[in-house]
Amino acid sequence: MTVRRNSLILGLAGVLCAWAGAVTAGDKPSDRADIGAAVTLQMQTAFNPNLPGSGEAVRTFTKTLKHMSAGALSVKIVEPGRLAPTRDMLDAIISGDLEAAFTWTGYAATKAPVFGLFGSLPFGPGPEEMASWVLEGDGRQIHRAAYDKLGVTGVPCGVQGPKGGGWFRTELNTVADFKDVRLRYGRLSGEVITRMGATLVPLPAGEFFYHLQQGKVDGGEMSTPAMDAALGFDKLGLPYYMPGWQQPSAVLDFLMKRERYEKLPAPFRAQIETACRANIAWTLSRAPHIQALALEKLKASGVVIKQWSPELMD
């Protein structure tokens, strides 16, 4: 663990200690008198709360927020797609049809390409560097300004670790191997593979397993090792390539329409932002553990873990 990572996580741990004291002090009814009636936000998530990693982060954030506010501010989790399609949640926030959302920043790239820097930057920063940039560096202002232009308050609320490199029905060791191969990847990583001769196949995450199983695509990315293992990709009998060059890290956001967010009492807004910082600390510490366990599980089930060749990575 690097000094930089230690400093970042210790700093975020300090945030946890700070609000822990605030919760104790805030348990008294008199301390809540200035914020009015209790509030429950309906928050649709892009991630199944029962899945590891980003799904767990949804539940952790809502529990933290409830404890911090002594129950005055709570969040009702709405399952993916229940009120709005996952990819359209930002539009639903802007229109006011959705009260709050917990999502991947990359979905917002359809509104402004700059969001791709936070959601899926090939060969980009790792999770610790991403967290530092979006919390304390120039990324903080870039992220905020991009959402401001849409009339949305976007609070960084988690940092996902690296994805797996993908599952493939064919060997990919050289640039020539990519010619005419049909692959599922994201927007920016798709530009990389198409330049190498591959055909980009846009597929919703929920359809990738079936298409890969049926041979309708030749391979591509799904998610992190923990997520891939939980979704049963080991049953395909295909090799799993590492590392996930296409997405070394990704920011998760809490979203509300700005005018709606600013109507919340100031203590609630502060608690949301502090709970999100705490959630970033949690995701940074949680990810390496569950990814290592997932890779061991995949190996035990017979999956061959392959490293990308030096020719491709260099």
Predicted regions and their residues:
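Bacterial N-terminal signal peptides that target proteins for export
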Residues: M1-G11
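N-terminal twin-arginine translocation
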Residues: V3-R4, A20-V23
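Bacterial N-terminal signal peptides
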Residues: L10-W19
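N-terminal secretory/targeting leader peptides
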Residues: G14, T24-M130, R140-D314
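Short beta-strand-centered segments that line the small-molecule binding cleft or hinge
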Residues: W133
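Polar helix-capping/helix-linker motif
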Residues: E136-G137
